[in-house]
């Protein structure tokens, strides 16, 4: 007699192996360059089994992207709590979010490389709104967190807000993510032969904060 609980655990473990293998390969190369067969081989799982979990490559890619941002959000929330985020003023909280992106560059450049390639891939594949919903929901929580910055700014005046909240969110955090992603991919020629662009990201952060405070 089959053990349903054991089967469920084994299925979840195989799924996770496929997701981890896909992320490893796609962040090291590009999403387009990696085939499902290569992912199955990397995970040491048969291709037929892979197709039982993911009907097509975009399904796997979107789940990888969704999981990345869900896990990152948990990490950000832990650090926010550790630093007593609710007690921060708006400028301090904005700096916290910018620092969170810089920390991604320091410690998880693979995430930034995958993320840079992700948007291009899903647009090329013409993924539907229904397909993208889990991913968009995972990203939307950051916009909700950013709302706290705006609410505090209106109360304490430590940030000068002259544009709408959505524009501010996109202009600041997405721009920072985009630049960090380019640095992670090595697409920006490093000054003086330096390969670590952390100082450049810190300079961008200071310019952003200086323009708003």
Spans of model-derived segments:
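Generic hydrophobic, amphipathic alpha-helix propensity
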Residues: 11-22, 39, 64-68, 72, ...
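Amphipathic alpha-helical packing segments from all-alpha helical-bundle domains
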Residues: 70-77, 92, 125-156, 167-170
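C-terminal peripheral helix-coil segments that are non-catalytic and often amphipathic
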Residues: 1-2, 100-103, 140, 144-156, ...
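Hydrophobic alpha-helical connector segments
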Residues: 63, 78-111, 165-172, 201
